[in-house]
């Protein structure tokens, strides 16, 4: 049985990435303060359809994701369909796979096209760290249910007397891994210590990311893949990511204190991604349908892979597990790639994965390979800057990476590119695209 993955429909047509778009990414409580993930999702999907001059009635499926879920609109995908002029009968459902969420939504639509169930679909994701599901304590929640059942005033007073002042305080969403209680930042600290990643190297990678992102924006290369967002009450707009340090100075990074291990740590706010708001989306079609409608795709999906590892130690190693599987399914080696886009959740996590790509020991012990994945050529790696600069709205990052690598390959005359990410829960995702 061949290990090659056939990302094609029954007619042998490839899955085309026709277009991609995102909102600018904004730090928490700044430009998108008060704007929900749903509103950002509708915003970007509407604009993507408009720019592509695609009849919304032709869209047969929308798969959209969110990580910080809002109880008021648990199926964000369906709400986007209802708010963007698509047929009310358009198939729509929501997914969540932590930071790999929009990789998952893209693959789900691709697989629907591969099976012949649909010909045209939209995938993406959105998250807001500024509009959060603030909840109540477990004790108060229990009491509220009991109050609803209580019949007499005396019963209600008895229930209320069980509560202390701290039980009445609002509870923000947890930032820790449910299974371990560790935050992503604490995991990044773990990885820095396990793999001997220095503070200087972390700061240098962050500086590189901000410098390249600034150059990319100033060159105009992101103009066609980032929309201008007008935010209610429509007295202002945002047309550029606002986390990028446009005058990044490497020496200034050393001034920050460690954020997660104050005494012995090396992970700081400057070499980590901030909490971010934003949304992204891509249009996928069968190759034949794209051609019939007159589109010139920005790329095609060649292979993809998802993996999972234990969460207790160094769980953000997803790229080191998912990438070799995606390469194998594409019949490729790392050196065959033209570009590599790796999600930079933390500089420590990124550098640890880069180190393990080149490790024969890791390949033999963890992957069962007789050779390393390969040393990363920095002239191919995150050439436009990465998440450390752009920011990281959890569910939006995957389709941001896919669009960005496809469009950069297009500018370079074609080739193959890798988009890969780690994710909470020990998850990993990788996708290889080809561009003509």
Curated annotation (Swiss-Prot):
Pathway: Lipid metabolism; fatty acid beta-oxidation. It is found in: Cytoplasm. GO terms for cellular component: cytosol. Its main location: cytoplasm. Its EC number is 2.3.1.16. One of its GO terms (biological process) is fatty acid beta-oxidation. The active site is at 99 (acyl-thioester intermediate), 392 (proton acceptor), 422 (proton acceptor). Heterotetramer of two alpha chains (FadJ) and two beta chains (FadI). This is 3-ketoacyl-CoA thiolase. It comes from Shewanella denitrificans (strain OS217 / ATCC BAA-1090 / DSM 15013). The gene is fadI.
């Amino acid at each position: 049985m061949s290990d090659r993955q056939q990302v094609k429909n029954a007619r042998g047509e490839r899955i085309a990435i026709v277009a991609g778009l995102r909102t600018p990414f904004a730090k928490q409580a700044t430009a998108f303060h008060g704007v929900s993930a749903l509103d950002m999702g509708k915003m970007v999907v509407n604009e993507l359809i408009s720019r592509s001059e695609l009849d919304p009635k032709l869209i047969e499926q929308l798969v959209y994701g969110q990580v910080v879920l809002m109880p008021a609109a648990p199926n964000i995908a369906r709400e986007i369909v209802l708010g963007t002029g698509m047929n009310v009968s358009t198939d729509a459902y929501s997914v969540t796979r932590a930071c790999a969420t929009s990789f998952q939504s893209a693959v789900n639509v691709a697989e629907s096209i591969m099976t012949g169930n649909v010909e045209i679909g939209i995938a993406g994701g959105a998250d807001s760290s500024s509009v959060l599901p603030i909840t109540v304590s477990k004790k108060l929640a229990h009491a509220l249910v009991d109050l609803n059942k209580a019949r007499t005033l005396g019963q209600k007073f008895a229930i209320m007397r069980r509560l202390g002042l701290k039980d009445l305080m609002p509870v923000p969403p947890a930032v820790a891994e449910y299974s371990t209680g560790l935050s992503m930042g604490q995991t990044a600290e773990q990885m820095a210590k396990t793999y001997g990643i220095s503070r200087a190297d972390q700061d240098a990678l962050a500086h590189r990311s901000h410098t390249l992102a600034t150059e990319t924006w100033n060159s105009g290369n992101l103009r066609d893949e980032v929309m201008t967002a007008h935010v209610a009450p429509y007295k202002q707009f945002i047309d550029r990511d606002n986390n990028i340090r446009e005058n990044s100075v490497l020496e200034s990074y050393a001034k920050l204190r460690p954020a997660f291990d104050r005494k012995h740590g090396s992970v700081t706010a400057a070499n980590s991604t901030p909490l971010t708001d934003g949304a992204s989306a891509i249009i996928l079609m069968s190759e034949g349908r794209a051609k019939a409608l007159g589109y010139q795709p920005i790329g095609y999906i060649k292979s993809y892979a998802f993996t999972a590892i234990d969460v207790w130690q160094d769980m953000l190693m997803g790229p080191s597990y998912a990438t070799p599987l995606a390469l194998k399914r594409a019949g490729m080696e790392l050196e065959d790639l033209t570009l590599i886009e790796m999600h930079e959740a933390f500089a420590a996590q990124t550098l640890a994965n880069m180190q393990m790509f080149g490790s024969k020991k890791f390949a033999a012990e963890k992957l069962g390979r007789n050779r390393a994945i390969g040393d990363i050529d920095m002239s191919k790696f995150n050439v436009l800057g990465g998440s450390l600069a752009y920011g990281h709205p959890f569910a939006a990052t995957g389709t941001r990476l896919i669009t960005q690598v496809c469009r950069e390959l297009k500018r370079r005359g074609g080739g193959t590119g890798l988009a890969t990410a780690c994710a909470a829960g020990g998850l990993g995702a990788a996708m290889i695209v080809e561009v003509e």
